[in-house]
Structure formats: structure tokens, C-alpha cells
A protein has these predicted regions:
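Double-stranded RNA-binding/processing signature
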Residues: 1-182
């Protein structure tokens, strides 16, 4: 498998992998390797671990708020845009292993690719050193966003805000038309 110098990335993460192959797998986009040696399985695991860590954090830090509010707060932290911003901060695009064709199409700069790879790295950290260490790393990486989190603020996605606004004005709920992205 292709090797990259990942020491700069590990420094940005504040974490040194015991099994460096886990990090390489987490960085390997499916365009580079269609076999099982790509980051999709680690992304699946990382997504679950990230949601669990943030859920636990919110549960402990905001003990008096209800489940719906915690769900909205978690969604404001764990989403493609948020993870994309975190990935840009650590220059993750410089480390993603992709096919040359995908790189020419600027695939290493796409939100989905960066946020998915970020989740894969969380999954790799979990497999490398377990939940406790992963929790410390995630909380450190999200520290700035967590500090700015305010339980009094309403955390709603734009669709929910639109529906509630229309409902308050006694309008019928909107009808949504979805299109397929290419």
C-alpha cells in the first residue's frame, strides 16, 4: 500500500498511532483502493464513536436539558460542515490518499471526502488505543466548538426553522422536492 509521511498529521491531531497502518487505511479514499483497504469501514466506526463521545459530553455538561435539545446540539457539532472545517484546520487534504484522477478533480478538497476521512481517523484512533484515548483526542480537537456551545441557543437545521416559522404564521408546511446530486 502507498505510504505517506503522516508525522505532521499526527502532530496536528495530538496523537501518535501505535499501528500506523490504521492511519494509512483511514486516509485511503475508495478511489485509490476498491478493495477493503480503504477508509469506508473506519468511517462507519468513527461516525458512531464521534456521536457517542459528543452525546456523552452533552449529557454530562448540560445535565438539565432535554433529549431533543441535546440531539440538536450534537447535530450542530457532528455534521459534514463542522467536520469539514475541522479537517481543513489540520490540513487533512494534504494527507488523503486518492487516485490521481480524483486528485485532478480536486476530490481531496471536497467536503464529503474530508469529513468522511475525519470520521475514519476517529475510528482508527479508537481501534488503535480504545475509547478513553479517543474521547480525549475528540474533546481536544473539538475544544473550541465545545467552548462556544451554549445550551440556551436554539440549534436547528434550516428546514426545521422554515417549518416552525411557517407554522407560527399559520401557513401550511412546505412541500420539498429533492434532486439527485451528481
Amino acid at each position: 500500500m502507498f505510504e505517506k509521511d503522516t508525522s505532521k498529521l499526527e502532530k496536528e491531531l495530538g496523537f501518535r498511532f501505535e499501528d500506523s497502518l490504521l492511519l494509512i487505511e483511514a486516509l485511503t479514499h475508495k478511489s485509490f483502493s476498491s478493495s477493503e483497504e480503504n477508509n469506508q469501514r473506519l468511517e462507519f466506526l468513527g461516525d458512531s464513536i464521534l456521536n457517542t463521545i459528543i452525546s456523552e459530553y452533552l449529557f454530562n455538561e448540560f445535565g438539565k436539558i432535554n433529549e431533543g435539545k441535546m440531539t440538536s446540539m450534537r447535530a450542530s457539532l457532528v455534521n459534514e460542515n463542522s467536520l469539514y472545517e475541522l479537517a481543513k484546520k489540520i490540513k487533512l487534504n494534504e494527507f488523503i490518499i486518492m487516485s490521481e484522477e480524483e486528485i485532478l478533480r480536486k476530490g481531496n478538497l471536497r467536503k464529503a471526502a474530508l469529513s468522511d476521512t475525519y470520521e475514519a481517523i476517529i475510528g482508527a484512533i479508537f481501534l488503535d488505543q480504545g475509547y478513553k484515548k479517543t474521547k480525549i483526542i475528540v474533546i481536544n480537537l473539538l475544544n473550541e466548538k465545545l467552548k462556544n456551545l451554549n445550551s440556551e441557543k436554539t440549534f436547528k437545521d434550516p428546514k426545521s426553522e422554515l417549518q416552525e416559522s411557517l407554522q407560527s404564521m399559520k401557513f401550511k408546511p412546505p412541500k420539498y422536492i429533492t434532486s439527485i446530486k451528481s
